[in-house]
């Protein structure tokens, strides 16, 4: 596990972009795994400005809310199109289908996509409770793509994106922890003091399902990029 501490979110995002650019330019990155939320927004803005050619790169995403159409401004389809896909050309882009009514079939469909497009670099954020994707504390390390019940803390963290608290979805489709760990390389991004405790448990704590991100200690190629605040408890 390589640890990089930077001055701020912009510097950390640029460091992550360097790794991604190098992988794409060398031809080592054919599939790029992407995350959503506030953490990677600056990375995507920098990627849009970058000269790196992504037309032969396929993308996959970690998760999507259950019940939201791709056209819904709160869906992750919309988020990705707004911040990245409408501004940068990729070969193909895959996300779980939030409108799928057969959860088992949708999860199997997405796992098939992941098997056809093995992830070369997976970008991750981390929740204040240590979740990666929507894999909440207690999720099995053997989990593959699944339908998850969102915890109160996760819904609370995401309610700022919705007009009303009751509009925040209660479920999501998420790549499982095993699905994430199958990526050849992982870049974990964390910025801000509110992520410091989760980062401490991820890097220094025991590998335990109560902090899902702690499983990254078992991955052979992880780069953790932090700002000074997120690194403050290390």
UniProtKB/Swiss-Prot annotation:
GO terms for biological process: carbohydrate metabolic process; glucosamine catabolic process; N-acetylglucosamine catabolic process; N-acetylneuraminate catabolic process. SUPFAM superfamilies: NagB/RpiA/CoA transferase-like. Its EC number is 3.5.99.6. The keyword Hydrolase applies. Keywords: Carbohydrate metabolism, Hydrolase. It comes from the Bacteria. The active site is at residues 63, 129, 131, 136. One of its GO terms (molecular function) is identical protein binding. GO terms for cellular component: cytoplasm. Disulfide bonds: none annotated. CDD domains: GlcN6P_deaminase (cd01399). Pathway: Amino-sugar metabolism; N-acetylneuraminate degradation; D-fructose 6-phosphate from N-acetylneuraminate: step 5/5. InterPro entries: Glc/Gal-6P_isomerase, Glucosamine6P_isomerase, Glucosamine6P_isomerase_CS, NagB/RpiA_transferase-like. PROSITE patterns: GLC_GALNAC_ISOMERASE (PS01161). Pfam families: Glucosamine_iso (PF01182). It catalyses: alpha-D-glucosamine 6-phosphate + H2O = beta-D-fructose 6-phosphate + NH4(+). NCBIfam families: nagB. Belongs to the glucosamine/galactosamine-6-phosphate isomerase family. NagB subfamily. Catalyzes the reversible isomerization-deamination of glucosamine 6-phosphate (GlcN6P) to form fructose 6-phosphate (Fru6P) and ammonium ion. This is Glucosamine-6-phosphate deaminase. The gene is nagB.
